């Protein structure tokens, strides 16, 4: 399986989630299963079956996160010398050439993407157009609504 890029913040968030799942939810679910067992007949015990189902979902999420972390190539963009070039992990200010509207995006891994939070996937059309370009460059982004031209205003390593 190939490694996929992830920011330091993305890896930290996944590690915190695993810690919460293992340290808080897992013990709570085990307790709920134990309490449901005490109620008697397990065949028709809705509380028991609900707790077991929740346990399965939590364990699956733990396995999923651990697999992602083991296959992640964590990239600390702050450790890379600033060159004005757009690379994975950089935060980029771009201006729409037509409307002069400026937006800021951080280029992150697929699992970290959150457009409302200003984080776009490295595989998104905007990120693919920006990667490798430098401050001052004009880029053409192909979108479903048509081509949009942007100018790279600033590239930051934060």
Curated annotation (Swiss-Prot):
InterPro entries per the UniProt record, alphabetical: GreA/GreB_C_sf, TF_GreA/GreB_CS, Tscrpt_elong_fac_GreA, Tscrpt_elong_fac_GreA/B, Tscrpt_elong_fac_GreA/B_C, Tscrpt_elong_fac_GreA/B_fam, Tscrpt_elong_fac_GreA/B_N, Tscrpt_elong_fac_GreA/B_N_sf
Disulfide bonding pattern of the chain: none
Alphabetical list of Gene3D superfamilies matching this protein: Transcription elongation factor, GreA/GreB, C-terminal domain, Transcription elongation factor, GreA/GreB, N-terminal domain
Molecular-function annotations in GO: DNA binding; RNA polymerase binding
Keywords attached to this entry: Coiled coil, DNA-binding, Transcription, Transcription regulation
An example Gene Ontology biological process: DNA-templated transcription elongation
Transmembrane segments: none
Residues in coiled coil: 53-73
Function: Necessary for efficient RNA polymerase transcription elongation past template-encoded arresting sites. The arresting sites in DNA have the property of trapping a certain fraction of elongating RNA polymerases that pass through, resulting in locked ternary complexes. Cleavage of the nascent transcript by cleavage factors such as GreA or GreB allows the resumption of elongation from the new 3'terminus. GreA releases sequences of 2 to 3 nucleotides.
Family, per entry: Belongs to the GreA/GreB family.
Protein name: Transcription elongation factor GreA
Source species of the chain: Pseudomonas aeruginosa (strain ATCC 15692 / DSM 22644 / CIP 104116 / JCM 14847 / LMG 12228 / 1C / PRS 101 / PAO1)
């Amino acid at each position: 399986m190939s490694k996929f890029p992830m920011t330091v913040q993305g890896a930290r968030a996944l590690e915190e989630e695993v810690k919460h799942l293992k340290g808080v939810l897992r013990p709570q679910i085990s307790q709920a299963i134990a309490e449901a067992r005490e109620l008697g007949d397990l065949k028709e015990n809705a509380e028991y079956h609900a707790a077991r189902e929740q346990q399965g979902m939590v364990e699956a999420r733990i396995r999923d996160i651990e697999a992602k972390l083991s296959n992640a190539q964590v990239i600390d963009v702050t450790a890379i010398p600033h060159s004005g070039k757009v690379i994975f992990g950089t935060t980029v200010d771009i201006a729409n050439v037509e409307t002069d509207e400026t937006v800021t995006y951080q280029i992150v891994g697929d699992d970290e993407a959150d457009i409302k939070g200003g984080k776009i996937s490295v595989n998104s059309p905007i990120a693919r157009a920006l990667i490798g370009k430098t401050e001052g460059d004009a880029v053409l982004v192909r979108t479903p609504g048509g081509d949009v031209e942007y100018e790279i205003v600033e590239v930051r390593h934060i």
